[in-house]
């Protein structure tokens, strides 16, 4: 083990001992120290679910990337393990960027992007991003002596050697495949496909998909590719993507394409892109396939352009709650992993509760909960819910029935930076908003709309004492409310 990795492990252990766990997210992965971003290596090994992530332990801002590591059996209660990778080799000295993991020959294999710099003939330095592997036992990992195993020199000449990152690996029959985010010399985002029989010798296959319309960003980060029911799904996170009405608002977006994939020719016929998450804080999702057949997705619960953390907090970055995916009506629908029900406590239920003006319901309060609100077709114009609320703070979700717009507003959640606080969502169901399921943790709100047809993720930095929930309607209406505290 390198001295750099030993140092990171010692530092994170020291910081963990100093951290008040009662102020951290209860059931979401958060930075053990410093900073985390993209989820990496979401995989099954030795009977456990592993998640790694981009990690800089020494400051709450982005720095030379390490890989942090957590493990779970149920995706709700997570155990922090020591850091897995540090940028300690010549080929990754500028960072161990994002990647994935797979079990092979009883080893846990990490595939990641090693970042380094080369000196050009004219004396200028230029970055290079190449794909590397490491072999481990679920806790400690050894980098392959002949890294990198996939380099930009293997790609067509018009593909960038600088922006070539975030490999996602899988196996079909006797062949390993990986896709890698890329762009060409016209600044067109794309993903490339490579293959190997032994994980060590790789070859370029094809450009699997590209921004053929010119509307889907300049660089496709963190790609994922998998079958889901009778379709294949390509997920990526395009940079510099322009908004289209109520879609693709984050600049750094995450989108998915459904399509048909020919495994022999490696041709993917993709459909139009769709937004994965309509909220303010969601990027770089990655999926894994559980032993029971569920395809589950997790993402970084943050935006590159936002800093929604308390000023006194010395760490930054969380992951979303893992979500189950399914294809329905030509779209991906998402649900919180069903394991969350194992942690339901203190139920509180209202059937046909009257809302007229601002209303509070006894027993409906708290900051770590699973809250579902259902409404039938009724005569109102505006309906709103304020969460994590008191006299000073609130995060509101306001539905304007006439336009079918749901507005999220965290302006008063405690944020002290000039960040985006409002997002408007056009409800996809032509019948309008019927059900909202909120998953609240201490620093986040995840909203599942109409049984997961749309999802919106929002980070908040509200003092934990603000635990009120308020309802409002401009006309008398009735709702059904079901609340469970989440208790670990």
Predicted regions and their residues:
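Beta-rich carbohydrate-recognition and catalytic domains
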Residues: 1-166, 171-216, 227-278, 301-352, ...
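Beta-rich accessory regions
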Residues: 9-15, 252-488
């Amino acid at each position: 083990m390198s001295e750099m990795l030993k140092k990171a492990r010692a530092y994170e252990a020291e910081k963990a001992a100093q951290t008040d766990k009662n102020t951290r997210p209860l059931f979401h992965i958060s930075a053990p120290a410093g900073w985390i971003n993209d989820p990496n290596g979401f995989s099954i090994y030795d009977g456990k679910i592993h998640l790694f992530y981009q990690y800089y332990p020494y400051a709450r801002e982005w720095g030379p990337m390490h890989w942090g590591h957590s493990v779970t059996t149920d995706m709700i209660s997570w155990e922090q393990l020591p850091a897995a990778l540090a940028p300690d080799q010549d080929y990754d000295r500028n960072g161990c960027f994002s990647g994935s993991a797979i079990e092979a020959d009883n080893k846990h294999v990490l595939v990641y992007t090693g970042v380094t710099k080369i000196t050009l003939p004219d004396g200028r330095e230029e970055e290079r991003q190449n794909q590397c592997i490491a072999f481990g036992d679920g806790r400690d990992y050894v980098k392959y002596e002949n890294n990198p195993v996939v380099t930009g020199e293997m790609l067509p000449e018009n593909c960038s050697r600088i922006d070539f990152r975030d490999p996602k690996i899988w196996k079909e029959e006797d062949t390993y495949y990986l896709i890698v985010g890329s762009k060409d010399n016209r600044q067109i985002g794309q993903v490339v496909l490579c293959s190997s029989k032994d994980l060590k010798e790789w070859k370029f296959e094809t450009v699997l998909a590209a921004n053929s319309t010119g509307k889907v960003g300049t660089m496709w980060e963190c790609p994922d590719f998998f079958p889901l029911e009778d379709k294949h799904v390509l997920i990526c996170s395009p940079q510099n993507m322009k908004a289209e009405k109520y879609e693709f608002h984050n600049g750094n977006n995450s989108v998915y394409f459904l399509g048909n994939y020919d495994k022999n020719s490696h041709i993917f016929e993709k459909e139009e892109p769709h937004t994965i998450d309509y909220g303010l804080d969601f990027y770089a999702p990655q999926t894994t396939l559980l032993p029971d057949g569920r395809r589950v997705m997790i993402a970084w619960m943050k935006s590159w352009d936002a800093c929604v953390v308390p000023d006194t907090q010395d760490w930054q970055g969380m992951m979303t709650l893992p979500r189950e995916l399914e294809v329905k009506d030509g779209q991906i629908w998402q649900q919180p992993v069903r394991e969350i029900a194992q942690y339901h406590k203190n139920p509180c239920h209202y059937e046909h509760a009257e809302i007229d003006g601002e209303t509070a319901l006894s027993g409906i309060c708290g900051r770590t909960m699973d809250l579902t609100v259902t409404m039938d077709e009724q005569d109102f114009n505006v309906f709103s819910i304020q969460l994590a609320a008191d006299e000073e703070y609130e995060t509101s979700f306001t539905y304007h029935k006439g336009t079918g717009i749901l507005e999220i507003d965290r302006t008063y959640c405690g944020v002290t930076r000039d960040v985006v606080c409002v997002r408007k969502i056009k409800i996809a169901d032509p019948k309008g908003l019927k059900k909202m399921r909120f998953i609240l943790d201490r620093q986040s709100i995840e909203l599942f709309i109409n049984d997961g047809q749309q999802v919106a993720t929002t980070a908040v930095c509200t003092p934990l004492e603000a635990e009120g929930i308020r309802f409002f309607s401009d006309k008398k209406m009735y709702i059904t409310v079901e609340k469970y505290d989440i208790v670990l």
